[in-house]
């Protein structure tokens, strides 16, 4: 078999007159009665191959048996297309290959999905036949971008003198965060490894080990409830460095991301990226990962509401809650009463009891609650919300967390429905100064907002013992277009501070020693100040490739129920395997 001389998508007019050897899949076959045209596809694109009895009767006879997705080896001569046959939508649209020989390397059954970017297959069918789904050009291009992003990051970190170091996949189960995936030990009866949720502790120990600059394209595992931008196993760009300040880490990441955007996407983004404190993000956008491609910020009306005539507003403020509103400019005529009812049901999903609304008309405010506002109050509302005729004003009065969640989500919905978002924009944002801890009323304890190894502000260390809820974290999240790309922080590197953190989280001394004794001891051997960040590679590629589902950026992903439709994992194992591990199943009965 002759070697391939050209990729299908790379045969151009420069090759006219040459004999070429092509190998690929049949995208489409057209029989025009005496002539057969085949679109031959490989990962670079498509080229048209013509089977003509005047060129080769033998090749034409073989072509008559060929169907879609057959794998072919074609030998032929490159010729220019006639003037009326030129297809400028194809890179190879000015030429075609006159086949002299063809060899069927493999036949194919009729495929259960259409191998094309606009396939009509459901996602379940695509995942079951993932090897066919991956043949679609849009899928290959996504993974080519993933490769380019990873290569750019590796090259950048190499120039910054980072070492790529692999950390263990079989490790120790620790509390906090999501549930671990557990792996039973055959050698140690009744004991389990855990698959890492992140390399957090090991990368900190590498800093203790004097490596100073580490990175890893790390596989991570979390047994958590899934959604469109979550998977049980995922890849993160894990980075840690000693002796750097927060500003130095953020500056380095900005330089890395601007290079990624330019090299992998061909887009210039300017640095430094904007920075916003967590409290400001929540106040202005109702989100810790705001999409800043459009405005429509939340406005706090609590002071006004406390003295207005609308009891729903006043009682919310009196009970310690707040009232906030968003002004959907020019949207009054676009939302009927039925549409607003749908918005009301939408905010209820986020805990809101309802959605108050007003439309601004030339002669004043109109809507179910307009009667509660006199002329003076109406003017204050209009001025505060910068409202003009044609605007739609939407209000939520509730607990602060409910107001933020519901209006933050409503803002995003309106941004999409009103087409306010410029999809060509890439808006990066740092969210900084996070709370160190979050209180869970159900569990009656504090949890780490990021993780238990995040350094508090120096002046807040003592608050861990006196007022933990007030302690701020030296933490930062990188946000792109309303998605959290990753998070990082400066780390605790002193034993006494780490012990205070564990105590604030409700760990006894014994529990802390049992779970993290190796880390606490390491801190006694001259641990340097250090910090880092972890960026979600899958999510970054999803955004750059314009995909809406994380599964499209992972070669063999899991479904929303954490199963693989291709291999049918997870699956039962043989009784002998369980016996070898000294395990016995005790399954709960379905109710």
Swiss-Prot record:
Annotated site residues (Important for tRNA non-discrimination) in this chain: 84
Catalytic activity: tRNA(Asx) + L-aspartate + ATP = L-aspartyl-tRNA(Asx) + AMP + diphosphate
Chain sites annotated for binding ATP: 222-224, 231, 484, 536-539
Localization of this protein: Cytoplasm
A Pfam short name: tRNA-synt_2
Listed GO MF terms: aspartate-tRNA ligase activity; aspartate-tRNA(Asn) ligase activity; ATP binding; catalytic activity, acting on a protein; nucleic acid binding; transferase activity
Database matches in InterPro entries: Aa-tRNA-synt_II, aa-tRNA-synth_II, aa-tRNA-synth_II/BPL/LPL, Asp-tRNA-ligase_1, Asp-tRNA-ligase_1_N, Asp/Asn-tRNA-synth_IIb, AspRS_core, GAD-like_sf
Keyword vocabulary terms for this entry: Aminoacyl-tRNA synthetase, ATP-binding, Cytoplasm, Ligase, Nucleotide-binding, Protein biosynthesis
Lineage top rank: taxon: Bacteria
Binding site for L-aspartate: 176, 222, 450, 491
A GO biological process held by the record: aspartyl-tRNA aminoacylation
Chain intervals for the UniProt region annotation (Aspartate): 200-203
GO cellular component, one term: cytoplasm
Signal peptide bounds: none
EC number(s) per entry: 6.1.1.23
Location (main, coarse): cytoplasm
The protein's role, per its UniProt record: Aspartyl-tRNA synthetase with relaxed tRNA specificity since it is able to aspartylate not only its cognate tRNA(Asp) but also tRNA(Asn). Reaction proceeds in two steps: L-aspartate is first activated by ATP to form Asp-AMP and then transferred to the acceptor end of tRNA(Asp/Asn).
Subunit structure: Homodimer.
Family membership: Belongs to the class-II aminoacyl-tRNA synthetase family. Type 1 subfamily.
Name recorded for this polypeptide: Aspartate--tRNA(Asp/Asn) ligase
Provenance organism: Bacillus cereus (strain ZK / E33L)
Lineage, highest ranks first: Bacteria, Bacillati, Bacillota, Bacilli, Bacillales
Gene assigned in the entry: aspS
